[in-house]
Amino acid sequence: MIAYLSGVVREVREGSAVVVAGGVGYEVQCPAGMLARLKPGEAAEFSTRFIVREDAQLLFGFPDADHLKLFDLLTSVSGVGPKLGLALLSAMPVSALAAGLIGGDVKLLSSVSGVGKKTAERLALELSSKVPEHLAAAASGAAGGKRPARVSSTAGHDAVDALLALGFREAQVRAAVAELLGADPEASADTLIRKALGRLR
């Protein structure tokens, strides 16, 4: 079992990163938000889940225990494998995902690629009472649908408007753009749109 990994990023790929630790390169599949922050040559730490199948051995990495806990909860639901669990964590911040689960927001959950209505309903039903208390508290404002994620910069507003025009849901769009701005407050609208599209599709 590999529960934690610390090393130097060698390469960032689509959906994963190669991390060198102890002279060995590990391919770590990560949420999109984490991948966007990884840079070759820099040190990185991951809370990990190692999954062994008949045809593959997969290592999933997360920035903290909260992401890992939510990943484990998601994949405990019938019909939700690790790839889909990762897709859900890539589509929005943990707090927004927790809000959707707590509030039974089937529309939000089913807006993620690969999540059908029945799966979204099952996620909401089975996990609404299992989300850790501190995540529930962080998401309590959003769970009522009254306070969308705050986007303060002009570039952020422009990015939100452009993404809404493409048909994405407002809660998802605002959450994605707000998280990107948190990582890079000076990001341009074009950069925000490009990176947000990678998460929302």
Swiss-Prot record:
The keyword DNA-binding applies. Has three domains with a flexible linker between the domains II and III and assumes an 'L' shape. Domain III is highly mobile and contacts RuvB. The RuvA-RuvB-RuvC complex processes Holliday junction (HJ) DNA during genetic recombination and DNA repair, while the RuvA-RuvB complex plays an important role in the rescue of blocked DNA replication forks via replication fork reversal (RFR). RuvA specifically binds to HJ cruciform DNA, conferring on it an open structure. The RuvB hexamer acts as an ATP-dependent pump, pulling dsDNA into and through the RuvAB complex. HJ branch migration allows RuvC to scan DNA until it finds its consensus sequence, where it cleaves and resolves the cruciform DNA. Residues 143-150 are annotated as: Flexible linker. Belongs to the RuvA family. GO terms for molecular function: ATP binding; four-way junction DNA binding; four-way junction helicase activity. Residues 1-63 are annotated as: Domain I. GO terms for biological process: DNA recombination; DNA repair. It comes from the Bacteria. The keyword Hydrolase does not apply. This is Holliday junction branch migration complex subunit RuvA. GO terms for cellular component: cytoplasm; Holliday junction helicase complex; Holliday junction resolvase complex. It is found in: Cytoplasm. It holds the Pfam family RuvA_C. Residues 151-201 are annotated as: Domain III. Residues 64-142 are annotated as: Domain II.
